[in-house]
Design a protein with these regions (language model features):
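Short hydrophobic alpha-helices that are characteristic scaffold elements of the AMP-binding
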Residues: 129-132
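Short secondary-structure boundary segments
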Residues: 100, 143, 169
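A glycine-rich helix N-cap at a beta->alpha junction
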Residues: 87-96, 154-176
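Structured binding elements
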Residues: 135
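C-terminal helix-cap and adjacent tail motif
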Residues: 4, 8, 18, 22, ...
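Glycine/small-residue-rich phosphate/adenosyl-binding loop
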Residues: 48-122, 151
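Active-site helix/loop module of the DD-peptidase/beta-lactamase fold
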Residues: 141-158
Length: 193
């Protein structure tokens, strides 16, 4: 089944959905996704991991510098280490630690600004949306000790962690948190000039 899932930057991407649902709009697709915090122990198949990594290749970055680096964490011993740096590991069967190389990111010519957070977050968005297409759950975690996660995962100094993504099959009965349904009114975040 072909499902249109994204209109990021006014470009529509068409994906072949693994589910039986058809979403006629990106809005409906986005409304159906929620942060999953309870996971089945079932491992994620390599072909699905590869599909998640392929959408990172498509993520736009400033000047196409492509500073992203994804650390795929599947070994049990490494997953246990994550519990020492965050209380939000959620016992997922795998994690993506999304980082950006501070030596490769775009730097503003006159201001002290780097594209680390934006470039990394666009990759995060691509991953969590593709995970939903593949029937996987995910949640974006930034509540971790930055230097400690670099130490336990053994990533180089030039890599800046942007987000930790617990990923896996949602446990039966997984449902959105109450906060998921709290949305600001459009008039509260838009101002026409």
């Amino acid at each position: 089944m072909i499902t249109i899932i994204s209109c990021l930057a006014n470009i529509y991407f068409v994906y072949r959905s693994c589910s039986t649902k058809h979403f006629p709009s990106f809005k409906e697709f986005a409304e159906s996704r929620f942060s999953v915090r309870t996971f089945s122990p079932k491992p994620v198949e390599q072909e699905k991991i590869d599909a998640l990594l392929r959408v990172v290749q498509m993520a736009p970055t400033a000047e196409n510098k492509q500073p992203q680096k994804i650390y795929v964490i599947t070994k049990e011993e490494d997953r246990k280490k994550l519990k020492t740096v965050t209380k939000y590991a959620f016992n997922a069967p795998m994690y993506f630690l999304v980082c950006c190389d501070k030596n490769k990111v775009w730097k503003h010519q006159t201001e002290d600004y780097y594209s680390i957070e934006i470039d990394g977050t666009i990759s995060v968005t691509h991953i969590i949306l593709e995970a939903h297409v593949l029937g996987l759950g995910s949640v974006v975690v930034r509540s971790f000790q930055t230097e400690k996660i670099k130490e336990v995962i053994k990533i180089p100094e030039n890599m800046v962690p942007v987000a930790l993504l617990p990923i896996g099959y949602p446990k039966e009965g997984s449902k959105p948190s109450k906060l998921h349904f709290k949305k600001n009114d459009i008039k509260d975040f838009v101002e026409y000039l």
